[in-house]
């Protein structure tokens, strides 16, 4: 749906990803673009991720669960600052995000700058309305980021640390060239149970960011 000014009334998720400490280090943008393309395979993608400027990439999604998956995967990597803007966009959307505009894009820029700041407690920030809901999402994301960091520090990072609990342990073990027991231990070390429990909660909160929680929507209709 589009309003009279040409802005979408549907919520969109604009994710800006900036390489951390890129000065003097190899450009990892091609790597992360290939990684995101493989991970999402078009799922929830409205505008594909692409380089915007320098070592920064940006994409537009409409699926909160896909957003959570991308954010957590990049947090495990540890080499990126992430800014998520939630809100309307100006339509029609172009083929590349650097040519797009709208509230969600402004919020994504503000969020990634916040995530890059020295005062940031986690390399991820969220901007959306209502502000209180965005703050709750950011807080939960921060706790997830801390958990992911602890898991990686204990040996849960790398390819094994990114393995998904939804796949068969035998298949994952075969792909990694290790035993099923090693996969199970690796996932436990990487705090997989805690992450699996938190993922749907964060996705739900993201889905409510633009519209507000169910109770608020019922009050508006009354």
Per-segment meaning from a language model:
Residues 1-222:
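Regulatory and interdomain segments flanking nucleotide-handling catalytic cores
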């Amino acid at each position: 749906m589009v309003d009279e000014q040409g802005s979408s009334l549907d919520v969109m998720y604009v994710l800006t990803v900036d390489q951390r400490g890129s000065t003097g280090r190899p450009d990892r943008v091609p790597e992360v673009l290939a990684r995101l393309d493989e991970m999402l395979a078009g799922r929830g993608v409205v505008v594909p991720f692409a380089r915007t400027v320098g070592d920064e990439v940006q994409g537009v999604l409409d699926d909160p669960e896909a957003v959570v998956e991308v954010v957590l995967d990049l947090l495990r990597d540890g080499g990126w600052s992430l800014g998520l803007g939630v809100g309307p966009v100006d339509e029609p959307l172009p083929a590349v995000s650097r040519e797009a505009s709208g509230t969600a894009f402004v919020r994504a820029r503000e969020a990634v700058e916040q995530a890059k700041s020295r005062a940031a407690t986690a390399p991820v920030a969220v901007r959306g309305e209502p502000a209180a809901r965005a703050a709750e999402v950011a807080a939960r994301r921060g706790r997830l980021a801390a958990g992911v960091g602890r898991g990686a520090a204990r040996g849960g990072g790398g390819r094994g640390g990114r393995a998904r609990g939804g796949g068969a342990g035998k298949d994952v073990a075969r792909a990694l060239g290790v035993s099923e027991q090693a996969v199970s231990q690796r996932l436990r070390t990487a705090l997989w149970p805690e992450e699996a429990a938190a993922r749907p909660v964060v996705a739900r909160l993201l889905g409510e960011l633009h519209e507000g929680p169910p109770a608020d929507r019922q009050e508006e209709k009354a």
